[in-house]
Design a protein with these regions (language model features):
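Substrate-binding/active-site clefts of carbohydrate-active enzymes
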Residues: 202-206, 226-242, 248-428
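Short proline/glycine-enriched turn/loop motifs at strand-loop junctions of beta-rich domains
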Residues: 35-41, 137-144
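Conserved alpha/beta catalytic core and glycan-binding cleft of carbohydrate-active enzymes
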Residues: 396-398, 416-560
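Short beta-strand elements bearing conserved aromatic residues within extracellular beta-rich modules
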Residues: 42-44, 144-146, 182
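A structural motif
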Residues: 39, 141, 279, 396-397, ...
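The feature marks proteins involved in alpha-glucan
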Residues: 1-29, 51-138, 152, 163-246, ...
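Short strand-turn-strand beta-turns centered on an Asx-Gly dipeptide
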Residues: 45-48, 147-149, 187
């Protein structure tokens, strides 16, 4: 008769595998258990003595009775697989919990701004045994397992330990190395449905269309941009020239065979071009990992992963470092407003709307076909702010351009009557998003002086670039979308008709000093058949170039 808890384990439904696997005292005897599929024989080696383990009939569970307790350092498993290959490994289920109560508390409270330092997968050593520690948040799961090639993607082999009310799961797997693809297999506690998910905190991912996370290398990049960082700290960005070159790494330049260049190749080609044109900074369209090329990076699945299209995290660090050494700053377009519905990523992560609102009137962008973060959930604050600070801390970025802020601020953004829910006061302001944005900007400014937080905000929301202690949102600067739209409409007119539209020029001056504005000529204005800038200009070729020169001169001399 198989005990109920072992049946639960064999069915991959046990909430706490540490109650069954590992070494346990029962009836004054020590029972050591191992679950391992695709093996013919299993042994335990203690003090160089090799002892066979007994297979539970018709299962992949092995056990042996021992006369005493042994620390995990003093025994090791050995298995013989179906191909007659021997392998040795330590027991993952005889280690103590590793997650600190303080980390779990701060994460659940929305106050852990460096959660990436303990969440996700990372190299770890416990009891002088090396391996990888996995930690994931899935509060509505009944069982979470780490799966990968190292366990045949079998969710029964490495089920994780629940940390209780925090909703966080952990498992230290000894003897595995970096570079392996992995995912989490998650069983929902109510429906029993099983899903395979990439790690939300993964620092590296597979090259699309593959979707697994990769156990990151523990090697630290050796930075050489100390002079730039020291200078940036004292940079008076309000009164110094700031000329930004916006670029999309996937299309700026490609190899002769049409493939992507690497971060390192782009850096070395980019520097002389940027220096020649006199730009002070480059701004990258999102390189946080994304599955669909056509999204330009704005449908993010890996908030801590530089896109594998162009290389690994070490390569991206080189990109930033190389530009810094040549006195060029680097900004990144960062997308906390929404995320895609791809099954392998954040959507319905533990079988519920964990990262998103389950209510479609709050949780879905119909225009973009994406999901909206649930800013009222404190763990989302920890997740997103940790992502923002990760790029500033680990990759020395000089600032973030926060995408689609207007869609975060308004509950009725791009919605008709009856398609949205008002806030508790009956208004259309997303109060939870406002709280999140202020917390984000306060955290970034306090920790990274000189780094800029820039808002792409297309409405007249007041005090976007004012400090939070003055009632503002706390951004450093705001994109002046109104100036861009009005100016491009004016410049596209035939000069004969411009005299009737001077309001397109004068209106921007009426509010020019209400915010710290950046004057943009955005990628959004040259896509979807909107024509290039020179294509928008009227007249023949000579006149088009003359008008474009006028546009640039007007832009650079605009008061503000």
């Amino acid at each position: 008769m198989i005990p109920a808890d072992i049946k639960q384990l064999l069915a991959a439904k046990h909430h706490d595998p540490f109650q069954v696997l590992g070494l346990h005292l029962k009836d004054e005897k020590w029972i050591l258990r191992l679950f391992k599929s695709r093996v013919k024989e299993a042994y335990v080696i203690i003090n160089e003595q090799r002892m066979p383990m007994k297979r539970l009939p018709a299962t992949d569970l092995f056990e042996i009775e021992l006369t005493q307790h042994y620390p995990v350092q003093e025994y090791i498993f050995e298995t013989l697989n179906d191909d007659n290959q021997l392998s040795r490994f330590h027991d993952p289920y005889c280690f103590s919990p590793i997650l600190k109560d303080e980390d779990a508390y701060l994460f659940n409270s929305g106050e852990h701004f460096y959660a990436y330092k303990f969440m996700g997968a990372r190299s770890y050593s416990q009891n002088d045994i090396n391996g990888v520690l996995f930690i994931v948040w899935a509060p509505n799961a009944s069982r979470v397992s780490v799966v990968g090639g190292f366990n045949y993607w079998d969710g029964r082999i490495h089920p994780m330990r629940s940390n209780g009310a925090s909703g966080i799961w952990e498992l230290f797997i000894p003897d595995i190395e970096t570079g392996h693809p992995y995912k989490y297999e998650i069983r929902n506690r109510d429906s029993g449905d099983i899903s395979l998910k990439m790690d939300p905190f993964a620092r590296e991912t597979e090259y699309r269309p593959a979707t697994a996370s990769i156990i990151p290398s523990s090697d630290d990049y050796k930075w050489a941009d100390q002079k730039w960082i020291a200078k940036r700290t004292d940079f008076d960005w309000l009164h110094q020239p700031l000329s930004i070159y916006e670029m999309h790494l996937g299309s700026c330049q490609k190899a002769e065979d049409g493939s992507y260049l690497s971060y390192t190749q782009i850096a070395e080609k980019l520097v002389p071009y940027i220096k020649k044109l006199g730009y002070t900074h480059v701004q990258l369209l999102p390189i946080t990992e994304f599955p669909y090329d056509g999204s330009w990076g704005y449908q993010v699945t890996g908030y801590f992963s530089p896109s594998k299209r162009f290389g690994n995290p070490h390569d991206f660090a080189y990109f930033v470092d190389y530009l810094h050494q040549h006195d060029i700053g680097v900004f990144l377009d960062w997308v906390p407003a929404h995320f895609p519905k791809d099954d392998h990523a954040l959507a319905n992560f533990d079988g519920t709307g964990l990262y998103e609102h389950e209510d479609p009137l709050l949780g879905e962008h119909k225009d973009w076909g994406t999901l909206i973060f649930n800013y009222g959930r404190k763990e989302i604050h920890s997740f997103l702010i940790s992502s923002a600070l990760y790029w500033l801390e680990e990759f020395h970025l000089d600032g973030l351009r926060v995408d689609a802020v207007a869609s975060m601020l308004y509950l009725d953004y791009s919605r008709e009557a009856g398609e949205w829910r008002p806030n508790k006061y009956g208004g259309n302001e997303n109060l939870e998003a406002v709280e999140f944005i202020r917390k984000l900007n306060e955290a970034a400014h306090a920790r990274y002086p000189g780094a800029l937080m820039m808002a792409e905000e297309s409405t007249s929301w007041p005090r976007v670039s004012h400090p939070t202690y003055l009632g503002g949102l706390g951004f450093s600067m705001k994109w002046n979308m109104g100036w861009m739209n009005d100016t491009l409409k004016f410049m596209s007119l035939d000069p004969i008709f411009r005299q009737y539209h001077h309001d397109k020029l004068t209106f921007a001056l009426m509010y020019a000093f209400t915010e710290n504005f950046i004057l943009p000529l955005s990628h959004d204005e040259v896509v979807h058949l909107k024509k290039s800038l020179i294509g928008k200009m009227p007249g023949d070729q000579w006149q088009k170039f003359a008008n474009l020169r006028l546009l640039y001169a007007y832009m650079f001399t605009q008061p503000g």
